[in-house]
């Protein structure tokens, strides 16, 4: 099929538009993808808007597709910008994603999974050497990035994470699926997590291509929480690592360090260590690719309403 025809089919898929006129008048220009600025919200507070009413999402235009061509994928990710609302590290903070027309896109649903040439798009939720527990809000329209909250307070890890951490778009760990490879453990109802081990610190919300290398089957509170180990495609060592054994050669001790970090990070809060399936070892690239494929299929069923959405936002 010609690329132009594939692009036309992709852009015609699942378009849905709604507007918020009152918010549109107050909306500030979106910053470029490489910058991160806090949006001015004083006029909204003065007008009496609540914190969640101040979220800037006046226009929805979803161009979701299950099979975008690499050309369409590249054009979409290049045109992305990030639009913050509220003060960083507060309950009100949200980071939205927009295209070059200023239309809000869901980082979970609208950014394509595949980036071409065996690579996948990665969305950084927690930059390396930081501790604020940021995450895509899967239950909010637009699925912006926000800081995790527990008992009304924003959450932090007890210490910095040493790698870029985030998620693969268009994936979902189905909580109704019992995985036979991991003692029939059910999915955790979230997108698949990624630990990106490259040397560069990513920006919050940065989207870039990564190469999968290995995967850990973490079991958190009885739920399966895959951790796909990746490296960014433009890292100086990206060409030297292609599978789990290469990681140990080029990044000695890293796989053990990743496993131990995620095993132990809840201990300072008085909780037991997390467990791991697959013999407590990182599995190879082939297993990682199977996990990505399977969870992409779970996501496709979710957005087609073939699976109960369990309070998740599909826009």
Predicted regions and their residues:
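PEST-like, low-complexity acidic/proline-rich intrinsically disordered segments
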Residues: 1-16
